[in-house]
């Protein structure tokens, strides 16, 4: 066994954990990654943008990731009959604009995780232990000890990194209970994620709508020579969003370029105590029953498709949207990365981008100061804190969920009218949908190994 002063435990095998492990290994650490789940990840689409794209290039993974993207060609709002209210908003901003409704890299979380895990596991000084949790942690002056569930034995490390998401076990085990409690900032937005089969009857109208406007569709692998989508595709490459009153919305998006599967999102904006309780403690059966009751009355084909798909989905996941906010991302020799330390929530679209950037900076600072982790962890916070704060800002002054999921029929009419205006005029391309303004400058050589 390697000396504990070069051995790091990363708890969590998602994007944050796998990227952290990759760069720590490049920096000369021996890395153990513990991942509690051995099952299929739920079907959530994630975005990679800005500085995070530069980091995946450094990892040599850009082309593989681009080859695995969903192929989403844009997003459209549909009416109560499931018909587009206006042409889709695409992906290509005009000069002077920063808008991109569908991001540069849109990929399913499970696909991105596999790519990052494969890259980390290929390194000789990274070990993944699946079906394993961290049960106990004890801090010492020059090391930190963890009891891992797969052996039940204490093991010594120089540091433990919590890359274990919103409900981070490392945060709970190493941070003051009151600090941990106050770190969770809930919203009144709820979402269920799951996948459904593609359906060929949805492709033709989308292909016709996209054909006259090839500038909306830069996804060349999906388009014919005139810019229209391949009529042989199995389902539309366009995301579709339908609304109903009481703050409800259904969003269906591509999972892959062939259209054989779709990701589905049932969204609710509500102060309902029943929603809060079922999201927190309800069984999956309770959650599906509640959502069935809320969404079954949707008119048009989208509601029926979504509700029926929810009941047969094997990757269903329902949650209340929360953010994690802390004044420090470390406690002793334990540090947090990604959602565990600073989740911006899906409302910002920044979660995966933050996780990748955070993993790179954390590993870089640890490689620079392996014998002074207090300095490394403090620098990590100082470098990223302003960027994280910006990334956690929910669009439209925090009102985005209320605007996107109106409570009244009048509000839905206004939203659809606004969508028609920005779609037909093209002014959406001049809007800013949350692109980076705070720049992250650090570069690390990881001992010349990157």
UniProtKB/Swiss-Prot annotation:
InterPro entries xrefs: FAD-bd, FAD/NAD-bd_sf, FAD_aromatic-hydroxylase
Keyword list, A-Z: FAD, Flavoprotein, Monooxygenase, Oxidoreductase
Induction: Expression is positively regulated by the cercosporin cluster-specific transcription factor CTB8. Expression is also affected by nitrogen and carbon sources and pH, and is also controlled by another transcription activator, CRG1, previously shown to regulate cercosporin production and resistance.
EC number: 1.-.-.-
Superkingdom, natural source: Eukaryota
Similarity annotation: Belongs to the aromatic-ring hydroxylase family. KMO subfamily.
Function: Monooxygenase; part of the gene cluster that mediates the biosynthesis of cercosporin, a light-activated, non-host-selective toxin. The perylenequinone chromophore of cercosporin absorbs light energy to attain an electronically-activated triplet state and produces active oxygen species such as the hydroxyl radical, superoxide, hydrogen peroxide or singlet oxygen upon reaction with oxygen molecules. These reactive oxygen species cause damage to various cellular components including lipids, proteins and nucleic acids.
Name of the featured protein: Monooxygenase CTB7
């Amino acid at each position: 066994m390697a000396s504990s002063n070069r051995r790091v435990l990363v708890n969590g095998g998602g994007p944050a954990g796998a990227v952290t492990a990759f760069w720590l290994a490049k920096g000369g650490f021996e890395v153990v990654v513990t991942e509690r789940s051995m099952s299929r990840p739920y079907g959530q689409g994630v975005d990679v943008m800005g500085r995070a794209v530069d980091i995946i290039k450094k990892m040599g993974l850009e082309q593989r990731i681009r080859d695995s993207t969903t192929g989403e060609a844009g997003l459209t709002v549909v009416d109560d009959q499931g018909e587009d209210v206006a042409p889709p908003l695409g992906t290509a901003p005009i000069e002077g604009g920063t808008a991109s409704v569908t991001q540069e890299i849109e990929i399913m979380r499970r696909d991105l995780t596999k790519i990052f895990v494969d890259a980390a596991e290929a390194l000789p000084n990274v070990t993944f232990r699946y079906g394993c949790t961290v049960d106990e942690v004890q801090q010492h002056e020059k090391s930190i000890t963890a009891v891992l569930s797969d052996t039940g034995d204490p093991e010594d490390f120089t540091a433990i990194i919590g890359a274990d998401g919103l409900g981070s076990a490392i945060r709970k085990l190493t941070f003051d209970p009151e600090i941990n409690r106050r770190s969770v900032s809930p919203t009144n937005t709820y979402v269920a994620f799951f996948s459904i089969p593609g359906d060929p009857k949805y492709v033709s109208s989308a292909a016709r709508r996209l054909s006259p406007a090839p500038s909306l569709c830069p996804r060349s692998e999906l388009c014919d020579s005139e810019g229209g989508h391949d009529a042989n595709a199995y389902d539309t490459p366009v995301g579709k969003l339908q609304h109903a009153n009481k703050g409800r919305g259904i969003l269906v998006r591509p999972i892959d370029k062939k259209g054989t599967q779709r990701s589905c999102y049932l969204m609710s904006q509500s102060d309902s105590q029943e929603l809060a309780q079922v999201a927190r403690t309800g069984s999956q059966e309770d959650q599906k029953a509640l959502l069935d009751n809320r969404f079954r009355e949707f008119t048009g084909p989208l509601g029926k498709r979504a509700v029926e798909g929810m009941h047969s989905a094997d990757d269903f996941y329902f949650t209340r949207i929360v953010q994690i906010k802390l004044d420090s991302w470390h406690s002793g020799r334990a540090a947090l990365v990604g959602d565990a330390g600073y989740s911006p929530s899906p409302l910002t679209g920044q979660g995966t981008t933050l996780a990748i950037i955070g993993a790179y900076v954390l590993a870089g600072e640890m490689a620079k100061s392996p014998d002074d982790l207090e300095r490394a962890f403090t620098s990590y916070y100082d470098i990223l804190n302003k960027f994280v704060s910006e990334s956690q800002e929910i669009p439209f002054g925090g009102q985005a969920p209320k605007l996107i999921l109106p409570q009244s029929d009048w509000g839905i009419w206004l939203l659809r009218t606004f969508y028609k205006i920005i779609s037909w005029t093209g002014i959406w391309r001049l809007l800013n949908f949350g692109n980076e303004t705070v720049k992250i400058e650090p570069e690390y050589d990881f001992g010349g190994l990157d």
